[in-house]
Amino acid sequence: GTPTTACSLPGGGGGWLWGGTCVQAMGRGGHRPSDGHLSPSPCCAFFSRCLCCFFGLYALSTSLALISSLFSLLTAKLSEYGLGSQQNSIRTNFTTKQLSELEKEFHFNKYLTRARRVEIAATLELNETQVKIWFQNRRMKQKKREKEGLAPSNGPQGRAREASEASDQSSSPSPYASPDSFSS
């Protein structure tokens, strides 16, 4: 967050309360050498305990709590944009409604265009990545079922054709049937 409360520093001077820690303001303390770049303030008497900002904003305390909270904020922001570590990703528990809609879509399309993925994600209140990964996993599941012989490999059209062929065979005699089966 942004510092909002003024505070006093040990040895005099003022600063801002940031994350519960008083930090030195760099406005007056920082100096600009002839090369034009800001350098850490020499007036920072407790320099070993703080990181002085090079852009004239604020010096930050190196307390573990503050570093930890800044790291958490950074990690959260990175993960919002899909740049965070995959180790911390949480397993998505899809609702029954979400699963039925995803399965319905998968029945018609094994692969989604980006536009369709965005549309489905918005409708089901998921993000694009969740929809994309669900479809990848579902295709792998289908492939595994086909390999094990538990699902037809032709997709929905193949199932309809198989059902049609099965009904044709039941209404007409099999070429392999015995002659006794015809004399009823």
Curated annotation (Swiss-Prot):
It comes from the Eukaryota. GO terms for molecular function: DNA-binding transcription factor activity, RNA polymerase II-specific; RNA polymerase II cis-regulatory region sequence-specific DNA binding. InterPro entries: HD, HD_metazoa, Homeobox_CS, Homeodomain-like_sf, HXA1/B1/D1. This is Homeobox protein Hox-B1. Belongs to the Antp homeobox family. Labial subfamily. SUPFAM superfamilies: Homeodomain-like (SSF46689). It is found in: Nucleus. Keywords: Developmental protein, DNA-binding, Homeobox, Nucleus, Transcription, Transcription regulation. Residues 166-184 have a biased composition (Low complexity). It comes from Ambystoma mexicanum (Axolotl). Disulfide bonds: none annotated. Sequence-specific transcription factor which is part of a developmental regulatory system that provides cells with specific positional identities on the anterior-posterior axis. Acts on the anterior body structures. Residues 87-146 bind DNA. Residues 140-184 are annotated as: Disordered. Pfam families: Homeodomain.
